[in-house]
Amino acid sequence: AKKGGNHVVLIDAGHFNPMESISDKLPSLLQFFPYVPLHVTRSMHWDSDHVVLFEDSIKDIAAEVVRCPEGMDKVLIGMDFFDATINRVAAMVIGARSTLKSLLLGMLSPIDTLKDAESTGDFTTRLAVTEEMKSYPFGAVWEFYCQQQNVPAGTEWLTEVKDYEQKIL
């Protein structure tokens, strides 16, 4: 991609080998490019096509975006849902919410503690904190965020989408 004379690398998560992680590429790319456009998607799956889900690969990408200096400002996140065999509105909602949840989870991590442990070679602390984070009450924070945004935290939105699908689509 090119913008204002700057060439940048577009990272399309859906076109990498499923065993390859793109999250480990972001820190390096952010050092050399003014911004990094990121196409967050999944390779084809039988159940949901390209719809972004709240899964490890997306959480890892979001964690790197949050942890990298200026990552939140320099990474441009885009998604698509045109291949979804499910309702397109539901695909958009599921994908957007999964991406937001992943970013929120990254923001809730004790980044300074992890960076200090990494820089001092204290890999025991880094591992212990990383494992402990997995049991943090993330769901309560997500529910509070949704409440603040006046949107349902659970699947209440699905009724509205199904009504729209039946009446409009």
Give each language-model segment a name.
Residues 2-11, 15-169:
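Histidine-acidic metal/acid-base catalytic patches
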